[in-house]
A protein has these predicted regions:
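Acidic, Ser/Thr/Gly/Pro-rich intrinsically disordered interaction regions
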Residues: 1-35, 50-227
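Extended, well-ordered alpha-helical segments in internal regulatory regions
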Residues: 39-53
Length: 227
């Protein structure tokens, strides 16, 4: 596998999510694609480690199969790499949005689908603890029927949304939200975490996966060099 090409495909999927947001059907489709590519990148890290440590694993490559082969071959460097990777992975997923992504990936692995996608409105310029409000838009085969229907529903919900968010903004001396500063986007819930914005989560995660790849390669070289 060429990890760089897979990362590029992942970034293309992110662009497609942004392009079709807030259509739940297409966002779900491209987010599913994004997560599949993300999982391939993780597998690619172990493919490179397998090649460099000479374990000669067969696909599909998992952490468990990597560990078992490393133990059979008594390859201390490979075992050390896996221990390092698990710690590094946990560190990279401590922050909220990488943690959400990890939970979404685990959900998909377990249930073979993504959590349900919903359309919500939010302030275009976000501040901490701003509210989001779900809107019910007519769908056809889970797709938005028209932008006009979306706009009508946003306008219908706008007065209540603006009243609530601006009450919070006033209390915190934050800028007032105007009518033209509202956008619709796709969100989902995962475990006890509510209203996770899909575009933002996917965007935040790209640097995380790139760091994992870069630092894994450095760690592999260090272990081999110091052998």
């Amino acid at each position: 596998m060429n990890i760089e090409e897979t990362i590029e495909k992942c970034e293309i999927s992110l662009k497609q999510i942004k392009q079709y947001d807030p259509d739940p059907f297409y966002v779900n489709h491209f987010f599913e694609q994004y997560i599949s590519l993300r999982d391939k990148i993780i597998e690619g890290i172990f493919e490179e480690a397998d090649r460099d440590f000479g374990l000669f694993l067969t696909k599909p490559m998992t952490e468990e199969s990597f560990l078992q082969k490393a133990k059979i071959k008594n390859d201390e460097n490979a075992i050390k790499f896996l221990e390092w990777f698990r710690i590094k992975y946990a560190e990279e997923h401590k922050n909220p949005y990488p943690n959400f992504m990890n939970k979404i990936c685990n959900f998909r692995k377990k249930f073979e689908k993504l959590p349900d996608v919903k359309i919500m409105i939010r302030a275009s310029d976000r501040y901490k603890d701003d509210i989001n409000q779900e809107i019910q838009v007519p769908l056809s085969n889970k797709k938005l029927r028209s932008k006009n229907e979306l706009d009508i529903e946003i306008k219908r919900q706008l007065p209540v949304f603006l009243e609530i968010i601006n009450h919070k903004r006033r209390d915190r001396n934050e800028p007032k939200v105007a009518n033209n500063q509202i956008i619709a986007s796709t969100f989902l819930d995962i475990e006890n975490h509510k209203d996770i914005e899909i575009v933002y989560t996917a965007e935040i995660y790209i640097p995380v996966i790139k760091r994992l790849v870069e630092e894994a390669r450095i760690k592999i070289k260090d272990l081999i060099r110091n052998n």
